[in-house]
């Protein structure tokens, strides 16, 4: 479940990624829009791991505002109000509850922390053109400021934009174990902030008695 959770929560990472130093005009404009908006999008992904010839695939939807977010994909729901994160597996009837870590080593698996501390999370190392989904796109290549040593930590990130625009169309995430996830983004929308944090908070009373809840707070 751990790798699947990382894949799903990493989707919100597509909205994070900048650095304290200089950045490309495209990335800077995109981040400015993200920081001032309620952002929603749909995604699909494929993940290739070194140990397997087959690919893991999936799809889902995301809604994010500041340090709060909701993700629904591959049978998992992830709710975060900026303080507590719930991961719900409806099929297995399992729930994991965690506090949002404030330490820097939480960046790799905590998209909310990446966004709330966006200036500390990534450095943009290059910006240019690339091929994505058979089309020429603009590509921003980023590396974590604080590189984790775990095999599940993020080694690198690429954000792909429609050529000449700030429209995010996809991303590529590489983990230290050599796994590569490729995301396609659709239905990206920016609306005025305004949702209460409570709307991103999971109501544990909705879980049935059959659920196994692991509380790590």
Task: List PLM regions with ranges.
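N-terminal leader/targeting segments and the immediate start of mature chains
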Residues: 11-55, 202-217
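Extended beta-strand-rich segments in extracellular/periplasmic secretory proteins, especially
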Residues: 114-176
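Beta-turn initiation residues at beta-strand->coil junctions
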Residues: 47, 73, 89-91, 172-175
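Positively charged n-region of N-terminal signal peptides that target proteins for export
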Residues: 1-4
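Non-transmembrane domains of secretory- and envelope-associated proteins
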Residues: 23, 148-156, 163-217
């Amino acid at each position: 479940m751990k790798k699947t959770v990382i894949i799903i929560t990493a989707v919100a990472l597509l909205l994070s990624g900048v650095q304290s130093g200089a950045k490309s005009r495209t990335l800077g404009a995109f981040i400015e829009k993200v920081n001032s908006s309620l952002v929603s999008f749909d995604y699909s992904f494929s993940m290739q791991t070194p140990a397997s010839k087959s690919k893991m695939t999936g799809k889902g939807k995301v809604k994010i505002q500041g340090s709060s977010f909701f993700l629904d994909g591959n049978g998992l729901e992830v709710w975060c109000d900026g303080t507590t994160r719930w991961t719900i597996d409806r099929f297995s009837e399992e729930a994991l509850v965690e506090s949002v870590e404030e330490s820097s080593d939480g960046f790799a698996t905590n998209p909310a922390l990446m966004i709330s501390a966006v200036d500390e999370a990534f450095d943009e190392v290059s910006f240019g053109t690339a091929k994505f989904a058979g089309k020429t796109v603009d590509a921003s290549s980023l590396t974590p400021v604080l590189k984790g040593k775990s095999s599940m930590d993020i080694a690198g990130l690429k954000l792909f934009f429609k050529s000449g625009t700030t429209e995010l169309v996809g991303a590529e995430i590489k983990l230290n174990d050599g796994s590569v996830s490729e995301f396609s983004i659709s239905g990206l929308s920016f609306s005025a902030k305004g949702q209460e944090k409570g709307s991103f908070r999971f109501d544990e009373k909705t879980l049935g008695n059959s659920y196994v809840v692991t509380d790590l707070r």
